[in-house]
UniProtKB/Swiss-Prot annotation:
Organism placement in taxonomy: Bacteria, Bacillati, Actinomycetota, Actinomycetes, Micrococcales
Domain observations: Consists of three domains; the N-terminal catalytic domain, the editing domain and the C-terminal C-Ala domain. The editing domain removes incorrectly charged amino acids, while the C-Ala domain, along with tRNA(Ala), serves as a bridge to cooperatively bring together the editing and aminoacylation centers thus stimulating deacylation of misacylated tRNAs.
Sequence similarity: Belongs to the class-II aminoacyl-tRNA synthetase family.
InterPro entries attached to this UniProt entry: aa-tRNA-synth_II/BPL/LPL, Ala-tRNA-lgiase_IIc, Ala-tRNA-ligase_IIc_anticod-bd, Ala-tRNA-synth_IIc_core, Ala-tRNA-synth_IIc_N, Ala-tRNA_ligase, Ala_tRNA_ligase_euk/bac, DHHA1_dom
Catalytic activity: tRNA(Ala) + L-alanine + ATP = L-alanyl-tRNA(Ala) + AMP + diphosphate
Cofactor: Zn(2+)
Keywords on record: Aminoacyl-tRNA synthetase, ATP-binding, Cytoplasm, Ligase, Metal-binding, Nucleotide-binding, Protein biosynthesis, RNA-binding, tRNA-binding, Zinc
Protein name according to UniProt: Alanine--tRNA ligase
């Protein structure tokens, strides 16, 4: 039975039993703090935790999942893969164990011609929680499973919880016995290679308390009991297709076979080290798994990058390419492998075929970039490994960091290649350097917003009274104070000077969302209370929390108040938000539909827009985008908003934000019909002419494959243009030209003169250094048996000038042991170059060691070949100390 038949059979079975079929959610998780969807129940977490009310009581899905925690084990076992599909059936307060268990048994054991999977019931085993007698009785008495094939397990094995106070409950797992050749008899408790888990049924029936691990108190039963089950599609396919592991199933095997053909190697199916072809088989399995995972991630909008999801995708693609190189394939391989994965997956996920042009372009570009990285980085890594071997030490964290930071060489590849060469890597030092880099970046990041109330308190409020948003149609709303929170705790009142959070029954204030900044304004009561609204957030969907300062009087829960939005700020913010839609449409006109939105932020007069694009925009493209945007403003397109079902909006081609979660009903914002049609819950101007003007002020990279533009609208745009006009007038006067049209030619001529002057100055400095070489060689000092020149050249033109001086000095010092160590400062950075001759090397002196000693003193690092090396630092005042450190090392090594 093919994989697409398995998934269709699953959905049909549960749909016939009144389950709502829910399409797979994106691999990009909507849960805070999670990068990927890692289980079938993840999209339903808000329902299980009571954060949202489910629109149905029964549901079923086949969910795409990604897990990369055990990425290093991929290919080595039959169980580890990064992409997998989890089929699940779910009940939200409807049926429970007495229906879930018989349905699972029926679907697994019913003959295929009758709609089931046809597994041999004599080969099925189950485990239950040792305290769950109800499940045991259902399996034994209702289903008829013999007692010897029902095993009771402890809390560690058969009890589910979220890891924190909340829902919990026992689970029951179903296993398939693959037979005695896979391991010993005795059931799942004895051997998990022979008895493979295929389905887990979780019974959420209790409320757990505080505690670590599985050591917590059960507080009582939940008022609504839920069912969450998950069946591994790949594992079931493995059994139904009679293959040894999931790599050999119909959705994965074609890539494995293509890798074997491309490399000229034979796939043996070896699963243990030492078996024939094991190493090659592992590499082919890595390729098959990672290519499929990459295909699915790119299809869901992920692009390669250096952080987060992008880094995971980049690592998967590069590990696949690296594995092919170890199989002897040095040319690009993804153009052969990726289409195989597409063809294997399109039966279940048609989007991989429909969007393959974009998917392949991203994947192939990443492979080309990685091959260049390998070419440049491998040479440097091999040299660093050679030096480390010669000095009988690990590859330093600094070397690994330099490869990663400067050349884009991933640390996992450094670890693999170093291990192959028999050298370890100081990974602790590397991680420390990475942490320092992240810390520096975080110091510049915006401070986090103040903490809001505990989520459980907010959910209680949502159940009691949500917040009706009136701000689409009005900016002033009579309303009632429903709650006041101080430090996350409900309080009955707040007085002048206090900073609190307020929940209103109805509110015109827009809560920050979708890239749009929150409204600000005031809340007043007839009793004289005045509240200044500084921020509005929705920590729980449907409940707006206003962060306020009580400016005067006292506000009480239950007070009748008037909420007023700052109309000027709102209008200017709406203009910026509408501007992001205009920019998005203009980008599509110029760059094509692949310029997909990756994020945005807008506030009064300013907008920032991130989009997918592989290269910097040129001046002509920027000008064209700006012109299209301002033409749309001139043409005064009406901004139309409509609410409709999500399916209808998608049929109309409405664009959605990558990674955003939408309900069944959505709001669509249009400008000039299909020219700009987006799903959007934000507020907007009535027509594009209300933007006034739009000026693009910057364009930059925000990670591999993504760009960012910033723009000003309205009065901010006019002020920007006025400032540029003033600057042009100033330059016209300074450069003594008649009009601004002459500026480019005059500036080019001035810069040419400056470059020529700098070239002449650099030449003079180089001549001066060379003229000094003879005298420096004659004044050389003796450090033990070594003739040494330890000289600070002061201000220099470049590191090349310093290197030339060191090599010249080494030649002049003759054939006796000699060291030339020279320092200088270029562009405010201290540099050091050391050159040693063969006799000095025979005496145990290495240029790289001497440079590292000096560079460490200067607050930096360096390296190079044993005969010549260079480095640098950050503290030029330490140059005398650096030269003294070299002198001491020469004395201690050769003296």
């Amino acid at each position: 039975m093919l994989s697409h038949e398995i998934t269709q059979r699953w959905l049909s079975y549960f749909e016939a039993r009144d389950h709502h079929v829910v399409p797979s959610a994106s691999l990009v998780s909507q849960q805070p703090g999670a990068m990927f969807t890692i289980a079938g129940m993840v999209p339903f977490i808000p329902y299980f935790l009571g954060q949202e009310t489910p629109p149905y009581q029964r549901a079923t899905s086949v969910q795409k999942c990604i897990r990369t925690l055990d990425i290093d084990e991929v290919g080595k076992t039959a169980r580890h893969g990064t992409f997998f599909q989890m089929a699940g059936n779910f009940s939200f307060g409807d049926y429970f164990k007495s229906q879930a268990i018989p349905m699972a048994w029926e679907l697994l054991t019913t003959a295929p011609e009758q709609g089931g999977f046809g597994l041999d019931p004599e080969r099925l085993w189950v485990t239950v929680y040792e305290g769950d007698q109800e499940s045991y009785d259902l399996w034994h008495d209702t289903v008829g499973l013999p007692a010897q094939r029902i095993q009771r397990m402890g809390r560690d094995e058969n009890y589910w919880d979220t890891g924190q106070p909340g829902p919990a409950g026992p689970d029951s797992e179903i296993f398939y016995d693959r037979g005695p050749r896979y391991g010993k008899d005795g059931g799942p408790a004895v051997d998990d290679d022979r008895y493979i888990e295929i389905w887990n049924l979780v019974f959420m029936q209790y409320q757990r308390g505080e505690g670590n691990g599985k050591d917590y108190e059960i507080l009582g039963e939940l008022p609504r009991k839920n069912i969450d089950t998950g069946l591994g599609v790949e594992r079931l396919a493995m059994l139904l297709q009679g293959v040894e592991n999931f790599y050999e199933t119909d959705q994965v095997r074609p890539v494995l076979d293509a890798a074997a053909k491309l490399s000229g190697r034979t796939y043996h199916g070896a699963e243990k080290a030492g078996e024939q072809g094991y190493d090659d088989d592992v590499r082919m399995r890595v390729v098959a798994d990672h290519v499929r995972s990459s295909l699915m991630l790119i299809a869901d909008g992920v692009t390669p990058g250096n952080e987060g999801r992008g880094y995971i995708l980049r690592r998967l693609l590069r590990r696949a390419v690296r594995a092919m190189r170890l199989l002897g394939v040095t040319e690009p391989c993804l153009p052969v492998l990726l289409p195989e994965s597409r063809d294997a997956m399109k039966g279940v996920y048609p989007v991989v075929a429909e969007d393959f042009e974009r998917i392949s372009r991203i994947a192939y570009a990443e492979e080309r970039a990685f091959l260049k990285t390998i070419e440049s980085g491998t040479t440097r890594l091999e040299h660093a490994v050679e030096v480390a071997k010669g000095e009988q030490r690990a590859l330093s964290g600094a070397d690994a960091f330099a490869l990663h930071d400067t050349f884009g060489f991933p640390i996992d590849l450094t670890l693999e290649m170093a291990e192959e060469a028999g050298v370890s890597v100081d990974e602790t030092a590397f991680r420390a350097l990475m942490a320092e880099q992240r810390q520096r970046a975080q110091e510049d990041a915006r401070a986090k917003k103040g903490a809001l109330a505990d989520l459980s308190e907010l959910r209680r409020m949502l159940d009691d009274h949500g917040s009706e948003f009136t701000g689409y149609t009005e900016l002033v709303t009579p309303t009632t104070v429903r709650a006041i929170l101080s430090g996350g705790v409900s309080v009955p009142a707040a007085s002048e000077g206090e900073h609190v959070e307020v929940v209103l029954e109805r509110t015109p204030f827009y809560a920050e969302a979708g890239g749009q900044a929150a409204d600000v304004g005031t809340i007043d009561s007839s009793d004289g209370a005045q509240l200044t609204v500084e921020d509005v957030q929705q920590p729980v969907k449907g409940l707006s929390v206003h962060k306020v300062t009580v400016s005067a009087g006292q506000v009480l829960v239950g007070d009748e108040v008037t909420a007023r939005v700052d109309s000027r700020r709102r209008h200017d913010g709406e203009a910026a938000h509408s501007g992001t839609h205009v920019i998005h449409a203009a980008l599509h006109d110029v760059l094509g539909p692949d310029a997909v939105q990756r994020g945005s932020f807008n506030k009064e007069g300013y907008l920032r827009f991130d989009f997918s694009h592989g290269e910097a925009l040129n001046a002509g493209q920027i000008q064209e985008i700006e012109q299209i945007a301002n033409t749309a403003i001139r043409d005064d397109f009406e901004v139309v908003t409509r609410e409709m079902p999500l399916a209808e909006a998608k049929k109309l081609g409405a664009m959605s934000l990558f990674g955003e979660k939408y309900g069944d009903e959505v709001r669509v914002v249009e400008m000039n019909g299909p020219w700009s049609r987006e799903l959007c819950g934000g507020t907007h101007v009535g027509s594009t002419s209300q933007l006034g003007s739009l000026s693009l002020v910057s364009e930059q990279s925000v990670g591999s494959g993504n760009r960012r533009v910033e723009a000003l609208v309205g009065l901010n745009s006019f002020n920007h243009l006025a400032a540029e006009r003033t600057l042009v007038n100033q330059l016209t006067g300074m450069l003594k030209v008649q009009s601004s049209a002459e500026l480019p030619e005059r500036l080019a001529a001035t810069l040419d003169k400056l470059k020529e002057t700098e070239r002449q100055l650099a030449g003079l400095r180089q001549q001066q250094l060379q003229a000094q070489a003879g005298q420096l060689a004659r004044d050389a000092e003796r450090v033990g048996p070594v003739t040494a020149v330890l000289h600070d050249a002061g201000e220099i033109a470049s590191a090349d000038a310093l290197r030339s001086l060191a090599l010249d000095l080494r030649t002049r010092l003759g054939s006796e042991p000699a060291v030339a160590a020279v320092t200088g400062v270029a562009n405010d950075r201290p540099l050091v170059v050391v050159a040693v001759n063969d006799a000095a090397r025979d005496a145990g002196l290495a240029a790289g060691q001497l440079v590292r000693t000096a560079a460490t003193t200067l607050g930096g690092g360096g390296g190079g070949k044993p005969d010549v090396a260079q480095g640098g630092g950050s503290d030029a005042a330490k140059i005398p100390d650096a030269l003294a450190a070299i002198r001491r090392q020469i004395q201690s090594t050769a003296g």
